[in-house]
């Protein structure tokens, strides 16, 4: 009986250690098509390789949250890290700046990555 209790405790301890593994998300911000001023496009923020799964992602226009944003379902890779795609329609121009802001337990403060229209 004591052997069973020890084995059960070791199993529980090893499972609880899975939550302790943390990986910071990789953030990629890009448009679906090459940017052309005045031409409708899609702004994408692909967030990948993160663990645990709790994450907040916002698309920003001139530092303010864009409200009409869609996203994929939370998915995981072979290594059990997670990934998501957030996207919205937008029409680029010379004056507006776009970015993706991500909050995750691995970041002390939210991380913001600007869209580079040349990418």
Swiss-Prot record:
Pfam families: C1-set (PF07654)
Gene Ontology CC annotations of this record: extracellular region; MHC class I protein complex
Presence of keyword Disulfide bond: yes
Leader sequence residues: 1-20
SMART domains: IGc1
Residues of the Ig-like C1-type domain: 25-114
CDD domains reported in the protein's UniProt record: IgC1_beta2m
Classification via InterPro entries: B2Microglobulin (IPR015707), Ig-like_dom (IPR007110), Ig-like_dom_sf (IPR036179), Ig-like_fold (IPR013783), Ig/MHC_CS (IPR003006), Ig_C1-set (IPR003597), MHC/Immunoglobulin (IPR050160)
Disulfide bonds: 45-100
Keyword tags: Disulfide bond, Immunity, Immunoglobulin domain, MHC I, Secreted, Signal
GO BP term, pick one: antigen processing and presentation of peptide antigen via MHC class I
Superkingdom as given in the UniProt entry: Eukaryota
Compartment list: Secreted
Function of the protein: Component of the class I major histocompatibility complex (MHC). Involved in the presentation of peptide antigens to the immune system.
Family from the record: Belongs to the beta-2-microglobulin family.
PANTHER family: BETA-2-MICROGLOBULIN, MHC CLASS II-RELATED
Subunit structure: Heterodimer of an alpha chain and a beta chain. Beta-2-microglobulin is the beta-chain of major histocompatibility complex class I molecules.
Protein known as: Beta-2-microglobulin
Native source species: Alouatta seniculus
Gene: B2M
């Amino acid at each position: 009986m004591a052997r069973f209790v020890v084995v059960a405790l070791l199993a529980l301890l090893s499972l609880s250690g899975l939550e302790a593994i943390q990986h910071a998300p990789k953030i990629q911000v890009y448009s679906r098509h090459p940017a052309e001023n005045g031409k409708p496009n899609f702004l994408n923020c692909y967030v990948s390789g993160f663990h645990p799964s709790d994450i907040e992602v916002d698309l920003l226009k001139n530092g303010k949250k864009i409200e009409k944003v869609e996203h994929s379902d939370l998915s995981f890779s072979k290594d059990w890290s997670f990934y998501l795609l957030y996207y919205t329609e937008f029409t680029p121009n010379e004056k507006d700046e776009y970015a993706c802001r991500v909050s995750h337990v691995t970041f002390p403060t939210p991380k913001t990555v600007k869209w580079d229209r040349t990418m």
